[in-house]
Amino acid sequence: MEKDMKLLGMGLFWNDLAVGDRFGTVGRTLTETDLVNFVNLAWLTEELFTNTEERENMAIAGRVVPAALVYACAEGLLLPMMQGTGLAFLNATLDVKGPTFVGDTIHVECSVSEVRATSKGNRGLVRTENEVVNQRGETVLAYNPLRMMKGRDS
């Protein structure tokens, strides 16, 4: 690619972000295929996710999906924010607020809560408060990752 050509799809640099900045992602519908593939990949053989007959006797109606799948999809939805600029995922707390089901469409609402330089000036730490919201406007998952991100060259 030519040096003077602008690259589409690159993430944000830590020094372009400020506390209070807010972002939203596009939506993604979770499908039966997503559930089956994730459960098989992670070997989450809990009958809650694998046995539709047993589901009839449980308190939650519908095909519930693991919160780990919801989290993984949320991170994928946020990827454009960090594409090529994210360096490390350092930590997070995670709180499951409610069930997510096959057929639900989720998006992520993200608010920057912390931005600071590291001792190496070309890197920074960014913490966001992320809420995963379904099509009914219900927050189903909340987490606050701290990430190391590249800085914009001066």
Question: How does the language model describe each region?
Answer:
Residues 27, 74, 96, 110-112:
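Conserved hydrophobic positions within beta-strands
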Residues 89-100:
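Short, conserved aromatic-histidine micro-motifs
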Residues 25, 96-97, 117-118:
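Short helix-to-loop capping/linker segments positioned immediately adjacent to catalytic or ligand/cofactor-binding
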